[in-house]
Amino acid sequence: MILTFLTIGRIVVNKMQDLPLCDLNEVKRTAKRTDSDISGCKFSGEYLESEDLSCLSFINCMFENCTFTDCDFERSSFVDVTFISCDLSNSSLDSSYLSRCEFRSCKLVGAEFKDCSIQGVAFESSNCGYAIFDKCKLSETQVKNSDMSSAELVSCNLKAFKTSGSKYLGTSFFRTALGGVDFSTCLVSGLRVSDTFRELRNAVFSANQAVELSMLLGIRIK
């Protein structure tokens, strides 16, 4: 049996349900005081606004039904971390490291991921509208059934980037090479790229999407 990244993620999530429930503010204070990692914790129903959560290291943790509004996660590290039904709208994760993480049914509207290293991360059934991923390195990243409308992926380095069933309406890929990325099952319209359209070279689109793109290129099809 072949297991996809998302299937493996669900197996891991089931195991994470058994993690001990922790208070984020309490473990944050301990981590900052002792300069230690936050490991093996489950956080549920946390509500934080404009909180400083920068320079923290989360390992093998789970966030469920948590709200982080305008919070600062800059220069933090997330390894084997799962977010389920969480709201990180307008929060900043700039210059952070994310490895083997999953965002499932999350709201990430306006969230900032600038200058992040993102490896083996999955965004599933999540709203990433207006999120900013400028200058990110995205390796083996999956975007499934998610909304990336008006998101900014400027000057990004994509490697083994996969997407399906997602929306890319007015998304900016300026100076981000999309060669090999298959958008054929996605809703694509009004992509923002450079005047030369070089970002679209060798990307994969459906026939209907090609008609939309021809308008972007100034080509009329009869």
What spans do the regions from the language model cover?
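Tandem repeat scaffolds
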Residues: 14-222
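N-terminal amphipathic/basic-hydrophobic helices that include classical n-h-c signal peptides
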Residues: 1-12
